[in-house]
From Swiss-Prot:
Single GO MF descriptor: rRNA binding
Species for this entry: Clostridium kluyveri (strain ATCC 8527 / DSM 555 / NBRC 12016 / NCIMB 10680 / K1)
Assembly information from the UniProt record: Part of the 50S ribosomal subunit.
Protein name: Large ribosomal subunit protein bL31
Name of the gene: rpmE
Cofactor mode of binding and number, as noted: Binds 1 zinc ion per subunit.
Amino acid sequence: MKKGIHPEYYHDSVVKCACGNTFTTGSTQKELKVEICSKCHPFFTGKQKLVDAGGRVDRFLKKFNLKNEE
């Protein structure tokens, strides 16, 4: 391997989530900021959220005659 071309690797990088959760991991950056993590992601929490983007969800539910479960 050539010397001086590889980025510095930090074994104790801190990852900060928007929900307030923090944990450490290995990375080439000292600090990482993420919007979603395993503590707040719907797949891991079991809570499903429907985000209405301009009434698209309502139109979809109406089109297929489904009930909105919030």
